[in-house]
């Protein structure tokens, strides 16, 4: 008599603690995946907004440039003169003062963020800052930065000052975390705020570490003479841009 082999299926019961862990792990994976999807979507939205804002700024800059050209042409046609608005922003570069300095001069240089040779910093034009610059004038050169130079400085030499640390501005998140509360979310927002000396210029400028430039290609002419006397220190007005381009 042949024996038939019967297959017996034995249901193994999963221990309760293992089942709960599996369920928790599954929920955790789902939550992580959901957060990642939401983060990617939010980043995509922010990038689109940054691009839109940059385009709006570019249109604003072009309109301002066109207005300036139109006003100059109109004045020339009418035989008059066009007087541009007074500058609201100065770029100051330290060119001297490695050795012992007068304590008052040293303190003023620090207030201007010019602690080291070839440091550069933006300064809002007002009575107080003009007086500060006059105190240290033989040690600095300054003038009115162009939009292109402001942009190059921030993109190529820009560092953030965060908790006393010099942090590279590698992406817009660094800016947004520190300045988002005042409406500055991207590097283009930062450039615009500095260029226009906007309502949150103080916060934007405080965020920036002093620019560390190199010695100018071709060197200086005569650092102990003023610019108006064929030297280097003092007010260069728009010609500050030529110098800084050689130092970036």
From Swiss-Prot:
Q: Where are the transmembrane segments?
A: none
What CDD domains does this protein map onto?
Ribosomal_L7_archeal_euk (cd01657)
Which GO terms of the cellular component aspect does the record hold? Answer: cytosolic large ribosomal subunit
Task: For the region Disordered, give the residue spans.
Answer: 1-45
Q: Which GO terms describe its biological process?
A: maturation of LSU-rRNA from tricistronic rRNA transcript (SSU-rRNA, 5.8S rRNA, LSU-rRNA)
Keywords linked to the UniProt accession: Ribonucleoprotein, Ribosomal protein, RNA-binding
Q: According to the lineage, what is the superkingdom?
A: Eukaryota
Q: Which residues form a coiled coil?
A: none
Sequence ranges of Basic and acidic residues compositional bias: 8-41
MF terms (GO), sorted A to Z: RNA binding; structural constituent of ribosome
Function description: Binds to G-rich structures in 28S rRNA and in mRNAs. Plays a regulatory role in the translation apparatus; inhibits cell-free translation of mRNAs.
Family of this protein: Belongs to the universal ribosomal protein uL30 family.
- Record's protein name: Large ribosomal subunit protein uL30B
- Per the UniProt entry, what species is this protein from, by scientific name? Paramecium tetraurelia
């Amino acid at each position: 008599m042949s024996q038939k082999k019967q297959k017996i299926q034995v249901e193994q019961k999963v221990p309760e603690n293992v089942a709960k862990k599996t369920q928790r792990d599954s929920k955790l994976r789902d939550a992580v995946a959901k957060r990642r999807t939401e983060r990617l979507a939010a980043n995509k939205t922010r990038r689109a907004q940054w691009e839109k804002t940059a385009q709006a700024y570019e249109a604003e800059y072009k309109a301002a440039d066109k207005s300036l050209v139109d006003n100059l042409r109109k004045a020339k046609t009418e035989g008059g003169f066009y007087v541009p608005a007074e500058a609201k922003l100065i770029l100051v570069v330290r060119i001297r003062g490695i050795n012992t300095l007068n304590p008052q001069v040293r303190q003023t240089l620090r207030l201007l963020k010019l602690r080291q040779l070839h440091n550069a910093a933006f300064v809002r034009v007002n009575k107080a800052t003009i007086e500060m610059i006059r105190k240290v004038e033989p040690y600095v050169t300054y003038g009115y930065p162009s939009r292109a130079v402001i942009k190059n400085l921030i993109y190529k030499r820009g560092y953030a000052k965060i908790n006393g640390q010099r942090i590279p501005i590698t992406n817009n998140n660094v800016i947004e975390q520190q300045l988002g509360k005042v409406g500055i979310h991207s590097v283009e927002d930062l450039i615009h705020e500095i260029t226009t000396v906007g309502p949150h210029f103080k916060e934007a400028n405080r965020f920036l570490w002093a620019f560390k430039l190199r010695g100018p290609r071709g060197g200086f002419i005569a650092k102990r003479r003023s610019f108006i006397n064929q030297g280097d220190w003092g007010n260069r007005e728009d010609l500050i841009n030529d110098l800084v381009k050689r130092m970036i």
